[in-house]
């Protein structure tokens, strides 16, 4: 079983994804069974009001190295906006970072969905984080 690393950009997102991983694993593997999970978090004030791209890129790189050192095979991040730096750091990461839009696209294809409604912050809506991944899968997205 793979060791999952969670880049905890927001406490809410990290807690939700951790809880869901454990719940889904229990359904598939049995009660109290889940993969090894490591979480790395920065205090939100470090990145909340800074130049997003440069600060986020540095934070994700640092987090990925710490998660790898903990034994993680790959990392995930439940914060939509942070994925804007994915292309900037992808090749420099010591472990794979699973893109949030790839997960959404995979799930949509599995359910034969052809269009999705994206709800989020203005930053996420305007960033185009989902556009390329969804278009490759021929899934259209509306924004609100």
What are these regions (language model features)?
Residues 1-144:
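Non-catalytic structural scaffold of enzyme domains
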